[in-house]
Amino acid sequence: MEEEILRVDGLCKSFVVEKSLTGKISQLLKNEKPEVVNALNNVSFSVKKGEILGILGESGSGKSTLARVLMGIHNADSGSAELLGRKLPGDSRDERMQNLRDMQMVFQDPFGSLDPRMTVRNILLEPIKIHGLKIDGDLEDFLANALEEVGLPKDCLDKYPSQFSGGQRQRIGICRALILNPKLIIADEAVSALDVSVQAQILELLINLKENRGLSMIFISHDVAVVRQIADRIIILYHGNIVEEVDADSLLSGVKHEYSQKLLNAALSLREGK
């Protein structure tokens, strides 16, 4: 039986829609209830060891909210999530730190997610220091090997984020996520800000990391072609609801929900230039 890395059961999250001052006054005068958006509605799924689960949906579908809830940035209204059998985000500080070590995130903006005042060396050392990670052997060799794994040379260590291309910065972000040897990576629109040719290189890197490390991944995107290329299994989100779950090979022929079909048809029309 395949090892289960992550289990999510009945996750729900809602937000009150923020209004302008005028809107708030009007709401009070009319005695109206605040408008609530259900960002996640009874979301359940699991991720196996060495599996890439694609989360596909348009803007506003709840994809990024899901990532933020799993990472502990937002608290769920109800439902539960477990990482390697431990409750997320964790019942104690030690458990929360262990969960953060075992589950890392790669962000959409490779420049905005890196501190421009820090060298690559310090960017990589920061999580090591925060988590008190003990390095066996020479630290310099450890950092050089970490960069090599994501396709970057050792001489990057003393450079700043502004000295790199978008693709190189995303490799640095991936390297930082890997430095703690996590069991699960959440990649939130991790290639959407990159050129198509660079996207392909980063996708290939992520697939290689999965195969070489046995790494599990949640890959979040609005791009049908990208998700189909990288994922083993795909969940389609619509207004916070899972409307479809299919193997990646069955995406083009196996979807049944009306929204899923519209999403695929729109992607095919764009590809054909219609």
Regions from the PLM with identified roles:
Residues 25-27, 138-155, 264-265:
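Conserved ABC ATPase "signature" region
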Residues 71:
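Helix-to-loop junction immediately C-terminal to a conserved catalytic motif
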Residues 79-90, 99:
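Conserved ABC transporter NBD signature motif
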Residues 179-183:
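A short, proline-enriched helix->beta-strand linker immediately N-terminal to the Walker B motif
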Residues 245-246, 254:
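ABC ATPase "signature
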